[in-house]
């Protein structure tokens, strides 16, 4: 992957959405698309799309729009789609098992390659094709499989302790499904996913703003 310019966090969060929809268009045989058409499909305003794309230079042509194949190839490079990314799942309970069954089937370059759990009856088994390891094997497997991203689905009470172990093992990114906002060094990035908070926010918007569609 080539060195990419620094872009705003909000733009970075939209890039996978662009890539997924461009993949759909390419598979459907669509050759080109305008920012207005893209806006209508993914519900981001056209000005936002054009601004996002402008961070990477001239990706389209005035009066023509965007070449779908060229844009897809460009974002595949930006998102490093040619590299297989192994991900560790920490916690093979109900949510963890759901994520194992999902296992990023819509992504061609990411997979959960190892899961870890404190329950000794789960360690040594295979769920949805993924081996479950004991927590004592965490550092060994993360090193052996060159994993630098982990998904955290453990109880809140042990979330920080497990996070510390992940950092010590060399993890650089954590997708945190626990309610706890874990503390990590500056060189480790955490993305928090709080389903309860998201639902409460959704209820608030419905109650106060109706069914207005909003983007990121």
Curated annotation (Swiss-Prot):
GO CC, one annotated term: cytoplasm
Gene3D superfamilies linked: NAD(P)-binding Rossmann-like Domain, Winged helix-like DNA-binding domain superfamily/Winged helix DNA-binding domain
GO BP: any one term: negative regulation of DNA-templated transcription
UniProt keywords, alphabetically: Cytoplasm, DNA-binding, NAD, Repressor, Transcription, Transcription regulation
Residues the record lists as binding NAD(+): 91-96
Compartment annotation: Cytoplasm
MF terms (GO), sorted A to Z: DNA binding; DNA-binding transcription factor activity
Superkingdom per UniProt: Bacteria
Residues in the DNA-binding region annotation: 17-56
Family, similarity comment: Belongs to the transcriptional regulatory Rex family.
Function: Modulates transcription in response to changes in cellular NADH/NAD(+) redox state.
Description of how the protein assembles with itself and partners: Homodimer.
Protein name per the record: Redox-sensing transcriptional repressor Rex
Native source species: Leuconostoc citreum (strain KM20)
Gene designation per UniProt: rex
């Amino acid at each position: 992957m080539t060195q990419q310019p620094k872009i705003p966090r909000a733009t970075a969060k939209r890039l996978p959405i662009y890539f997924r929809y461009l993949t759909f268009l390419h598979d459907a045989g669509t050759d080109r698309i305008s920012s207005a058409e893209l806006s209508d499909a993914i519900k981001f305003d056209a000005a936002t799309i054009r601004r996002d794309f402008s961070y990477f230079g001239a990706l389209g042509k005035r009066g023509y729009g965007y070449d779908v194949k060229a844009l897809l190839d460009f974002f595949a490079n930006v998102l490093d789609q040619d590299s297989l990314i192994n991900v560790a799942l920490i916690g093979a309970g109900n949510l963890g098992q759901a994520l194992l069954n999902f296992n990023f089937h819509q992504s061609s370059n990411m997979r959960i390659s190892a899961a870890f759990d404190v329950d000794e009856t789960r360690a040594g088994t295979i769920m949805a094709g993924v081996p479950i390891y004991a927590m004592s094997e965490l550092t060994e497997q993360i090193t052996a499989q060159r994993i630098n991203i982990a998904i955290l689905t453990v109880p809140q009470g042990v979330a920080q302790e497990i996070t510390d172990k992940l950092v010590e093992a060399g993890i650089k990114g954590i997708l945190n499904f626990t309610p706890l906002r874990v503390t990590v060094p500056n060189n480790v990035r955490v993305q928090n996913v709080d389903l309860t908070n998201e639902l409460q926010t959704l209820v608030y918007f419905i109650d106060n703003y109706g069914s207005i569609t909003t983007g990121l």
